[in-house]
Amino acid sequence: MKREKGRRGKKRICNFCVDKAEVVDYKDVQRLKKYITERGKILPRRISGNCAKHQRLLTTAIKRARNIALLPFTAE
């Protein structure tokens, strides 16, 4: 059997780079919710399309928001 080659999806553009955002605000809950699954997990870079720098900042912001109870740790 031949093995099919994997599909390459469309290259996604980092939304934070487009907006020229220097920081990711942990208080901006509506924006952070876009990068969390319905189970409460943080979306990976290959799915969200963020660059490495902003993915790191986003992860830190989500964890801060969880610690001060702005975002849930798990699904509701």
From Swiss-Prot:
Pfam families: Ribosomal_S18 (PF01084). It comes from the Bacteria. InterPro entries: Ribosomal_bS18 (IPR001648), Ribosomal_bS18_CS (IPR018275), Ribosomal_bS18_sf (IPR036870). Part of the 30S ribosomal subunit. Forms a tight heterodimer with protein bS6. Keywords: Ribonucleoprotein, Ribosomal protein, RNA-binding, rRNA-binding. Transmembrane segments: none annotated. One of its GO terms (cellular component) is cytosolic small ribosomal subunit. NCBIfam families: S18. GO terms for biological process: translation. The lineage of its organism: Bacteria, Bacillati, Bacillota, Clostridia, Eubacteriales. One of its GO terms (molecular function) is structural constituent of ribosome. It comes from Pelotomaculum thermopropionicum (strain DSM 13744 / JCM 10971 / SI). The keyword Transport does not apply. This is Small ribosomal subunit protein bS18. Belongs to the bacterial ribosomal protein bS18 family. The keyword rRNA-binding applies. Disulfide bonds: none annotated. Signal peptide: none annotated. Binds as a heterodimer with protein bS6 to the central domain of the 16S rRNA, where it helps stabilize the platform of the 30S subunit.
